[in-house]
Regions:
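Active-site-proximal inter-transmembrane loops
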Residues: 171-178, 232-258, 264-265
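Asparagine-centered polar/low-complexity signal
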Residues: 226, 260-261
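Non-catalytic, topology-defining segments of multipass membrane proteins
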Residues: 1-223, 228, 268-318
Length: 318
């Protein structure tokens, strides 16, 4: 199977050909990782089987539609996508952009667990490696290996991850907390339990919409930040990588699409740095801060932004 966003190229020795541009972008595929003709480990088959299952489940959506089922999916989108992944997995855990009381942190994290994007230790580790090695051969999901790989192909390629990060030593802050180790060891039971509860609550329609539709919707929105936001959009800051600000991804992902801003100031709890850059996650963080639940909220100072903008201007002149 070929990357549909890349002009067809001949394969060579089991590797996909490099140095092809992704359509409608200036991103050149320089990596040679073969997405299909490689060794598939047991975990790769398991992850691919699960992802296939939820996509097939979602195909029943037109035949099981009710407004109640749709509402379950929409609320699930907000809880797992906005609260769980964007605000908690990403801005809180991966970047320490803010602090929450432990009871609230763990509650919000659990919504992220139900997004079925792996346990917090795995997710945060991969994301921190992404920032450490962004758009290099050691990046976890860069489009230099093609759109498909950066979007979701990397999820099915544990060999690629093991080759580069055999020991995940960048999440010791999470490993020392029993809650996160418990979630890691019992992860799939929480996903299966969620599915069972949805079925018991509303039958097959709730399972289709609350598990299938909601899960793949949040999947692909999250994955678009990894793929589209490193391919299409604009760069306000010279970050030395492919990160882009993409307005339509930002609208769908509660502010995550202001990705070039994020790579310029990865510690910032605010991604939409301009007044017109809608960042729903930031608005929620500000609310939590106003009522005393969010503390140590980090944002770049005007001096830091000026320094970065000056650096960007100087590099543009060279």
């Amino acid at each position: 199977m070929r990357n549909l966003l890349v002009s067809v190229a001949d394969s060579d020795g089991g590797n996909q050909s490099a140095n092809r541009k992704i359509l409608f972008s200036d991103v050149v595929i320089t990596g040679t990782r073969n997405n299909w003709g490689r060794k598939w480990r047991t975990i790769d088959v398991q992850v691919a089987s699960w992802v296939t299952f939820v996509h097939v489940l979602a195909l029943f959506a037109p035949f099981t539609f009710t407004w109640d089922a749709f509402s379950v999916a929409f609320v699930g989108y907000l809880l797992t996508g906005l609260v769980g992944i964007t605000l908690t997995y990403h801005r809180l855990l991966a970047h320490h952009s803010l602090k929450l009381p432990k009871w609230l942190e763990y509650t919000c994290v659990y919504f992220g667990v139900l997004a079925a994007q792996r346990d917090p230790i795995f997710w945060v580790s991969m994301h921190r490696y992404h920032h450490q090695y962004v758009d290099s051969n050691k990046d976890t999901h860069s489009p230099i290996n093609g759109f498909w790989f950066s979007h979701m192909g990397w999820l099915f390629d544990s060999g690629y991850i093991l080759e580069k990060y055999r020991e995940r030593k960048n999440v010791e802050d999470l490993k020392k907390q029993p809650f996160y180790m418990f979630i890691r060891k019992t992860y799939m039971w929480h996903i299966l339990g969620c599915g069972a509860l949805l079925y018991a609550w509303g039958g097959f329609p709730y399972l289709v919409w609350g598990m299938g539709v909601r899960t793949i919707w949040v999947y692909h929105l999250t994955f678009l930040v990894n793929s589209a936001c490193h391919i299409w959009g604009t760069q306000a800051w010279n970050t030395g990588d492919l990160s882009k600000n993409n307005w339509w991804v930002a609208l769908l992902t509660f502010g995550e699409g202001w990705h070039n801003n994020h790579h310029a100031f990865e510690y910032s709890a605010r991604h939409g740095l301009e007044w017109w850059q809608i960042d729903i996650s930031w608005y929620i963080i500000r609310f939590l801060e106003a009522i005393g639940l969010a503390t140590n909220v980090k944002v770049p100072s005007e001096a830091q932004k000026l320094k970065k903008s000056t650096s960007t201007y100087d590099k543009a002149l060279k």
